[in-house]
Every structure is written in C-alpha cells, then in structure tokens.
C-alpha cells in the first residue's frame, strides 16, 4: 500500500508539479492559462496519495516512520511549505490581474522547490540514514549532499517530462508543438542524470552493489 501510494503520487502529482516547472519555458499568458486549466480539476487531490503513503508507513512501521522523520524533518517540512505556497499561488493566480506575474513566480518556485526537495529526500534515503538501535544518530544536515542534490535535479527533470507529456495529450496547436520540441531535450537530460545516479550509487553504497 505504501509503495502503491508513493508510485501513484509520483505519476499523478508529478505531471502536476511539472506544469509549474515548465512555466518559465512559456511566456505567453494565455498559454500559461491553458496549462493551468488542464490540471485545475485534479491538482488539489493528487497530494492525497502522498498522505496515504505517509499514513501507511506510520501505521505499518512506526519505528521506521519515526526514524525517517527524525532524519529528514527539515527537507520534509520545507517541501510541505513549498507545496502550500504553490497551492496558494495556484488559486490566487486566477483571481489576480496586476499581480499575476508575481503569482506565476510563486507557482514556479513552489513547484520547483517541492520537486527538488522530494528528490533530495530520495537521495538521502538511498545513501542511508545513520541509526543505532532504531534511533537516528546522524546530523541535521546529513541529507544535504552532492548526491542528494543530483537526485533532486533528476526528479525536477522527470516531473518536467511528465508535465510535458501531459500537455502533449491535453493541448493542441502552438502549445502542443512547443511541448513536442521540448520533450526530447528533457528525455536526454533525464537519461544522463539516471545513468550518472546509477553509476554513482554502487560506488557510494557498496552494500547496494
């Protein structure tokens, strides 16, 4: 159930966050409106799957939940703040006129930062958490490493690719053509990052190799 919840979250909220990451590539306000309208009916429900994964982890493995939360409380807290900030920007952008550009920046920032932090959390988990007798004994910033930053960038690119694919399916004309042009670049970047992470992981974590 935990894995299923996380997987569904990555797929569903991935393209959702990807829309915000792709915003800087689209300058036309009407096209940006179209981008947001494609996810407006579903965006606020996608985070439910992340809650399901967290609740499932707490219910099934409370010790693991406590350890992970102790080790990663800072990036998790910042991620939640970014998601809230993004949600506020999503709602207020539709009602703003003179300040729409500011809410666009907030939407871009919230989406990108939340995605990046999710990747850093993944990277920190892959690298391993220092524990003794089920208690986290590492430092507050052990999660902040070059490897976790690289996985953070990887998740940002992956979500951008998911968002690009979503827009290819849901839009047409000029916006769709722009997404078709952007998709190969995102796929190449994602492949390079995936290859680098795959090569570095066994090197940094012999137990995984």
Please state what every model-predicted region is.
Residues 12-21, 78-91, 157-167:
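Membrane-water interface of transmembrane alpha-helices
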Residues 1-9, 67-81, 108-112, 142-157:
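Alpha-helical transmembrane segments
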Residues 1-4, 52-64, 193-203:
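Membrane-embedded alpha-helical segments in integral membrane proteins
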Residues 42-111, 132, 207-208:
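Membrane-interface helix-loop-helix modules in multi-pass inner-membrane proteins
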Residues 30-33, 37, 63-70, 100, ...:
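Membrane-helix interfacial "entry" motifs
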Residues 92-209:
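Long, contiguous internal "core" modules enriched in hydrophobic/ aromatic residues
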Residues 1-45, 51-54:
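N-terminal signal-anchor module of multipass membrane proteins
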């Amino acid at each position: 159930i935990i894995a299923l919840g996380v997987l569904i979250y990555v797929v569903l909220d991935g393209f959702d966050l990807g829309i915000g990451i792709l915003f800087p590539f689209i300058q036309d306000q009407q096209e940006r409106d179209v981008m947001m309208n494609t996810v407006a009916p579903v965006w606020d429900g996608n985070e439910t799957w992340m809650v399901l994964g967290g609740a499932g982890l707490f219910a099934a493995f409370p010790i693991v939940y406590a350890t992970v939360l102790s080790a990663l409380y800072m990036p998790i807290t910042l991620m939640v703040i970014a998601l809230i900030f993004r949600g506020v920007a999503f709602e207020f952008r539709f009602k703003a006129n003179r300040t729409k550009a500011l809410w666009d920046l907030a939407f871009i920032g919230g989406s990108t930062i939340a995605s990046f932090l999710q990747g850093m959390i993944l990277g920190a988990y892959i690298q391993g958490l220092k524990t003794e007798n089920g208690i986290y004994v590492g430092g507050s910033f052990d999660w902040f490493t070059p490897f976790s930053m690289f996985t953070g960038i990887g998740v940002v690119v992956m979500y951008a690719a998911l968002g690009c694919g979503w827009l290819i399916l849901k839009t047409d004309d000029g916006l769709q053509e722009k997404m078709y042009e952007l998709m190969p670049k995102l796929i190449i970047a994602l492949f390079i990052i995936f290859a680098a992470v795959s090569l570095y992981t066994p090197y940094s974590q012999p137990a995984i190799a």
